[in-house]
């Protein structure tokens, strides 16, 4: 899509009648960041900012969550003290995430959808207003931070309800145009 642009027709679906990705943040008094991935059965507690700024390890089960905090500007890309950052936020927090009914490597864009769910949860937790375009651009930023180069439209599919016609123009800066397609009930 960088050379020629891209066009995709995409539909969001429920799996077994449920949204397969859930992310929730909870505030806590302790000045640390906790990630809890229920589907992967991993739990991590972070008290040093440097640990949260490292996202390049493909085997790190929390690389995606760390990239979210960086892309959203919650954690600075370099320097600073986690204690100071969390004091300004009024305390630490736990980010719970769970992906259900979707096998890894299914091709359903689960990592992009999880990324978007993390961004949305952070924005809502912080009281930051956002648009669909904000979600898309932050997920693309996360993919750049992690150097994963995910699908340019994956995050649109599962985050934006219904049937969508998605296009992008050629170029590095991928601005997505999303047109919601109405389907008559007949």
Which positions does each model-derived feature cover?
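Active-site signature of alpha/beta-hydrolase-fold catalytic machinery across serine-
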Residues: 117
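Membrane-interface helix caps and helix-loop-helix hairpins in membrane proteins
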Residues: 148-149
